[in-house]
């Protein structure tokens, strides 16, 4: 539960995107109706079931911003609930071009760029989540959907919640493509030491930012949600980049990349610290990121910055070949 910190009347909400709100609307037939959830835009919110609901701001009678009770990152609720919360945040801050619910499974479609934006995220009760049909029919529906899109069918399976689903897909021949750690941290003040490199934070990116790691393919996805972008320079040369986006009180880090010639010089740490400090200044107290489970160098870096392992997920593909850009999460 949260605390109601202030109440406002009228149709012009000042609540920030990502805030949890309770909104009361005038009902055309008389009386009122209420919605509670996290704001995703000026006229939409996502409720506790993960459903996106649009509303008419002109019909708002009153609204309240609910300030959540603060728990340490990765604590405060059963693991299965925390996993679903974090996966919801990671989807919100890296939104697919199209998404639709199949029961409580979320089917995400975005062309050929990134597995997260082109995969099914199960949700609901274990062992398989809660699709709208029996499990075998639901898997067949997923295959049909992505094959019609010209894409490899992929599941993004949070573990251990849906370990039985992972096993079932494995038995049916689905191939493991990537296994990733989800790591979390409480954000603390960051004291920046002397550095010969210059760090800038912006609310947008430019051609040079995209070009550093050939990120042109994900530009449209990144524009789909407000974010902060870090750039590190050696003189006039761009040598490192990173991104964070805020949702539900979390800072979701992604796209951290350093020019190979500058690796081992603390540039990654500069990027992450700058993004976390900017998040803290925006009132964000917790951070989450994804990293390939095989990337021990990055895992050690994030551990040194206070991140702890929370859970892992696996991408399983129905085909042995996959024409989708790999998830670049760190």
Which residues are covered by each model-predicted region?
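Short amphipathic alpha-helix that is part of the acyltransferase structural core
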Residues: 2-11, 15-17, 60, 68-79, ...
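Acyl-donor-binding surface of acyltransferase catalytic domains
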Residues: 94-98, 106, 134-207, 316-318
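Conserved GNAT acetyl-CoA-binding A-motif
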Residues: 149-158, 279-290
